[in-house]
């Protein structure tokens, strides 16, 4: 069993709040105010049940919130990320989704995709998938490579992006492929909690969505380390991507404030583009036939 570090629970006197009574008053919720439901950033499919004659889209993520794409190593998480990015812009991306509608609601807001793991070659090839699938280069798509940056530099860049840059007023979604590379120790309770609090602040202040990619523990569906535990608790949606050999299955593990989207599968075509496959439907038909036999 991992030993607890008492320093993780010590209060930093530098963080003591001044004028705490005023701060307390600012946190009181006015229950008379009318608050709109957070607008969607991305949806996957539609509810089978109609409400008032309308089949509503099923949430992948909404503005002001955090989602996670998780899976074991080499489960094709980055391919799933590319598929979602392309579908967020629309264009010809529907050619890659069969009958499943993956839809974005960013308008002209920026989608900024950050990679902390891949080499220059792989980063470029990954970034090129989006314009290839969309059919053109979206004006509001930016892909960044932070592999060579230190953890401290990545944190400073994130802070600048959300709080100081010219993009902050028009951020739609940030996708962080390699969340673990933004902390020194993914098992440090204090560090991971502070980092998660920053992400929550960033998404709230800019009213944008953040989607992070994280590994699962080996042979488990639990997200790795204290970082995974804390982020998983705060995320409004957690997707698990599981490698099934020729294809990967994508399913919603948890979602807050809505119904989970239906599981779907992806394969990779001969141009290294991800597409929604019919493997689940095919397996269901085989199982039905075997049951009849």
What are these regions (language model features)?
Residues 68-70, 74, 78-79, 104, ...:
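Phosphate-binding/switch region of NTP-binding enzymes
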Residues 96-191, 271-273, 278-291:
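Conserved inter-motif catalytic segment of the P-loop NTP-binding fold
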Residues 67-69, 111, 171-176, 208-212:
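Generic beta-sheet signal
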Residues 1-21, 32-34, 38, 167-170, ...:
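C-terminal regions of RecA-like/P-loop NTPase motor modules
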Residues 45-46, 151-152, 187-189, 215-220:
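Short, flexible loop segments at the rims of nucleotide/cofactor-binding pockets, characterized by
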Residues 12-123, 128-130:
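The Walker A/P-loop phosphate-binding site
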Residues 87, 91, 130-133, 182, ...:
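Conserved, well-folded catalytic cores of nucleic-acid-processing
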